[in-house]
Every structure is written in C-alpha cells, then in structure tokens.
C-alpha cells in the first residue's frame, strides 16, 4: 500500500550477530485515533548465508501486498507504516482502530504460514522505534559524508632525485648542407 505522495525510506542494517536486515519506513505523523498495532509475519525460504529473500519471495510479497493486504487495509481503515526483512521473514507493520481479527480473517487464506501479532499502542511506540532507527541511519550517512577527523595536511613535494641508469639521448640539431 505504497501510494502516490507517500514517502518511504529504506534502511539497511545488521543485527548484533551480523545478519543483514532491511527496513522500509513510511514517513508520516502518528494518527492517534489508530490505536492498535498489527504485524504480519510472512516467512520465506532462505538458501544462502545472508538469509535474505530471493526474487520469487519478493514476488510473493508483492502479490500479497497488492491482492490481499492493500484491499484489506483500505476496507478496514488500517495504515501500513513499515516493514522489516530479516532472517527468513518479512514483517509488515500497520496501525488501525478496527478489530484485528477482521484483518486475520481477510489475510490468513493467502498462506497458512502467516503469523499475526497485535497490541494496543495508542502512543505509536513501535512506529517511534522505527523512526528512531531512520534518524540513526540519517545521522550515520551525514557522519560518512563529513568525517570527524581533520583532513590530512598536504606534504611538501620531495626534491627531484637525479636519475640513475642509462642517460636519455641528447636532442641533436638537424644537419644542414652547404651549397
């Protein structure tokens, strides 16, 4: 449910154990009337050490979002605010005011392996954690562009050394003939 005019940020990170994690975080002001958080976990097969999804897994996620999640969120008045991809699962974060069981009913037929979590979160604390992660990433990017150490001083050029080895042949003036 990434519509026109929405601003999304991608943050790539690593967990403490070195496992790569990717976040997509939507930029929006919390809507306090949407006081429940709902998270969908969609597992995917992992085949390499990164434990990140392959192309088929991304296509499955896209199909789920377009054909199942977006219509359910629109019908029930929920807002998708972020996602996390790590260690064999996609996690989709959303806020709403409707009964979360209605979302479970609409989404569970897509795949029996889907997992669901919901909680009362009127202060949008989970979203605040995602935004804090985004701000940390922004600060790190700025840090990379403006290093903390002073630039190295330019050294004076070393004096030219005399060449050793075979000397270069001298240029000769062309000979002219006398008439």
For each feature predicted by the language model, list its residue ranges.
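Charge-rich, low-complexity segments
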Residues: 1-67, 74-81, 100-101, 129-152
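Acidic, proline/glycine-rich low-complexity IDRs
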Residues: 1-8, 98-179
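Residues in well-ordered beta-strands of folded domains
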Residues: 41, 95, 117
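Aromatic-enriched hydrophobic runs in primary sequence
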Residues: 51-54, 68, 94, 164, ...
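Residue-level signal for functionally critical sites in structured catalytic/ligand-binding pockets
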Residues: 57, 61, 69, 80, ...
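Amphipathic protein-protein interaction modules
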Residues: 63-113
């Amino acid at each position: 449910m990434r519509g026109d005019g929405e601003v999304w940020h991608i943050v790539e990170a690593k967990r403490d154990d070195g496992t790569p994690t990717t976040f997509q975080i939507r930029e929006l002001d919390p809507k306090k009337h949407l006081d429940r958080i709902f998270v969908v976990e969609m597992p995917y097969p992992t085949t390499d050490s990164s434990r990140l999804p392959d192309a088929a897994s991304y296509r499955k996620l896209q199909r789920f979002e377009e054909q199942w999640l977006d219509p359910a969120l629109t019908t029930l008045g929920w807002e998708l605010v972020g996602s996390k991809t790590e260690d064999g699962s996609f996690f989709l974060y959303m806020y709403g005011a409707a009964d979360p069981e209605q979302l479970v009913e609409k989404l569970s037929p897509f795949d029996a392996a889907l997992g669901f979590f919901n909680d009362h979160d009127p202060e949008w604390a989970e979203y605040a954690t995602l935004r804090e992660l985004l701000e940390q990433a922004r600060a790190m990017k700025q840090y990379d562009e403006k290093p903390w150490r002073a630039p190295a001083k330019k050294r004076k050029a070393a004096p030219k050394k005399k060449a050793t080895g075979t000397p270069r042949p001298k240029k000769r003036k062309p000979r002219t003939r006398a008439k």
